[in-house]
Amino acid sequence: MIQGRFDEERNQVFFEISLVGNDGELIFVDALLDTGFTGWLAMNSQDLDFNWPLVDDQYPMNTARGEGDFSIYIGTVQIDGQEFNVPVVVGDEIPEIIIGMEWLKTKRLVVDLVAGILSLG
């Protein structure tokens, strides 16, 4: 189980995850939990430096800003010491690293801001 952090100023929830490069190097990042994103992981193309395999470079998706074409990679994410190979949506317009609703199908999200509890596991 990993502990999250609530950004009160922007009303956003973040969890620290690790992105794993093909060389095994771990990069720790704060990922925004976005319940409007139905995938596993999304990130800006300038943040992609992991030598992950490309699956599709013209994948159409609807976003809050309309439809766009994105690249899809298979990336490795480490959460709470466990590694997952997941599809990663990559595009120039994605402002930060995002984890989406697919995680909530495999991980339990507990949020009680009054009690200071925010966990994913």
Predicted regions and their residues:
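Pepsin/retropepsin-fold aspartyl endopeptidases
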Residues: M1-G121
